[in-house]
Design a protein with these regions (language model features):
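Short gly/ser/thr-rich secondary-structure transition/capping motifs
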Residues: 41-48, 145-148, 209-210
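Conserved inter-motif catalytic segment of the P-loop NTP-binding fold
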Residues: 67, 94-177, 278
Length: 339
């Protein structure tokens, strides 16, 4: 009898799903195309900026970086900036908005300690509901946003939210394969629904071994903004959170405005922190190539750049290999010229 019941269930359950899917399609209004003139005359509200010029209203964005570089420090600070209406680094905040920050990784005590330090520069400007935190460490079983059930569980918290920050994809969507593009579709559909509801979303993610965002590139297709954090060439661990901010995608910024990369760093000040920014220095390789092109020797370049002679020699060889320089002679200190 049991095999018969199992066979019946194997037929009934898919049939029910098919019927439900058809009913859902039939319930939708018919599709309607709009003519070009009618479309151009539609009164569509312009998108204001949440964090100008990189995060507009109703945007989908990603911030990614290698582990331990400081992406959560930056994501938390971006959220507090929007939630308090306070500028951050080289970005302005036209007006205060409501932010929900969903953390899927940090222990609760670490998250609290970090937020205490980050919140000091913002003073008392942040309304209590301007920046709200949902931490997986407070929830038995954590948070699984790769399932419809997990997505629905956020609904009561999204009513007045302008910006939703998900930190990070690996922990909040752990049930989904990072490399399988089809597995991303249900999450992408949910994100697009949030955008239609005028909720902006910032995804925090890890970089892979190749330096790109880890997993399927399909994630980037609907995104308005993609921000990559990279380690400076002269970085050392004792410097803490110090990184280069690069903008790999800024949709609708055809003039390149706001897309200029820069360096950001954090320093401890009393019980809080302070962010600072600076223009990017030319990469060490480019600096060395320019000095070699001026006729400097390996020893002179090493002294000018405050690096070892062996490092200067390696940079010279790499510049030659990459075609940045062309040697006229074959000795170590032979003159070179720019290719």
């Amino acid at each position: 009898m049991l095999p018969v019941i199992n066979n019946l269930l194997s037929w009934i359950l898919p049939a029910r799903e098919t019927i439900a899917a058809r009913a859902s399609i039939q319930a939708r209004p018919p599709l309607q195309a709009v003519g070009i003139n009618d479309f151009l005359n539609l009164e569509i509200p312009a998108r204001e900026m949440l964090l100008a010029p990189i995060l507009p209203e109703r945007c989908l964005a990603m911030l990614y970086a290698p582990r331990g570089l400081g992406k959560s420090w930056l994501a938390l600070s971006m959220g507090l900036a929007v939630g308090s209406g306070t500028p951050l680094l080289r970005w302005s905040v036209p007006r205060q908005r409501n932010v929900l920050y969903v953390d899927g990784e940090m222990p609760l005590v670490s998250l609290q300690e970090r937020l205490k330090a980050i919140s000091v520069p913002f003073g008392t400007d942040t309304p209590n509901d301007g920046f709200r935190i949902l931490a997986a460490d407070q929830i038995d079983g954590g948070i699984n946003l790769s399932s419809e059930e997990g997505q629905r569980s956020l609904e009561p918290l999204l009513a007045d939210v302008d910006l939703l920050i998900l930190d990070n994809l690996s922990t909040l969507c752990a049930a989904t394969s990072e490399s399988a593009s089809d597995a991303w579709v249900p999450i992408q559909n949910w994100l697009l629904k949030l955008r239609r509801r005028e909720i902006a979303v910032l995804l925090v993610h890890h970089a892979g071994t190749n330096g790109r965002q880890r997993g399927t590139s399909r994630r980037e297709d609907p995104l308005d903004t993609v921000i990559a954090l990279r380690r400076p060439e002269d970085y050392s661990p004792e410097q803490g959170a110090r990184f280069e901010i690069h903008f790999e995608k800024l949709r609708n910024r055809v003039d390149g405005g706001g897309a200029v990369p820069f360096e950001a760093s954090v320093e401890n000040v009393g019980e809080g922190i302070r962010w600072s920014s600076s223009d990017l220095k030319p990469p060490l390789l480019m600096q060395a190539a320019e000095l070699f092109a001026e006729g400097m020797t390996v020893r002179e370049v090493a002294s000018a750049l405050r690096i070892s002679k062996s490092e200067a020699g390696r940079l010279r060889l790499r510049a030659l290999t990459d075609g940045l320089l062309v040697a006229e002679l074959q000795s170590e200190d032979s003159p070179v010229r720019v290719q």
